[in-house]
Amino acid sequence: MATLEGGAYNDALFGSRFSDFIHAHGGDDFVNGGNGHDLVFGDDGDDLLFGGKGNDTLFGGEGSDLLNGEDGHDTLVGGWGDDLLYGDKGNDILFGGHGSDLLSGGKGNDILYGGDGADILDGGKGNDVLAGGAGHDVFVFDGGGGNDVILDFTAGEDVLQISKGINGLDVSSPDDLASRITQVGGNVVVDLGHGDTLTLVNVDAHDIQANPDHYFTVH
């Protein structure tokens, strides 16, 4: 495993075709892990971290960072600051950490955890598991998203943002979505058409039907 070390200033670090350990340190850094299974630390500053090919682990650290796993089954940890996390391809794990973060799973069956702050979570394609954590979180769903599960939805605090006319359905209001729910044990399953579903864990269907605006927004 090769080791690359940045300095206190703004660095551009490029990994090899092997598995690299990259420590950017201070400054606003650009890092591309290249091939291999890389371990990347952005540390201080507002960093741009790209995993490249392979199953990579990226830590943003301090600052407002952008992390993109690219190919492979990657783990992304935002850390402090308002971070942007993109899993891209593969079955990825995304942790927002502190701050108001954007988490986008991309393709594959992903796990997204927002952490502290008001986060935006979009599982993307595949069957994803999402948890917003603390704060007022927004869960985004477009067509073709697969069968997703939200573990910690809180009515009146979090919101489900659904695309208008998702998958060709006649959906233009929260009331339209409330008519497409089913209670399955202690959970609610929302039918989003074309085989796509959204499962809300420990949620009551009667409350959704009585207060759809506390759950859904349509864009």
PLM regions and their residue ranges:
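Acidic, glycine-rich calcium-binding repeat modules characteristic of RTX/beta-roll
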Residues: T3-E5, N10-F14, S19-P174
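Low-complexity acidic/polar repeat-biased segments
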Residues: M1-A2, D175-H219
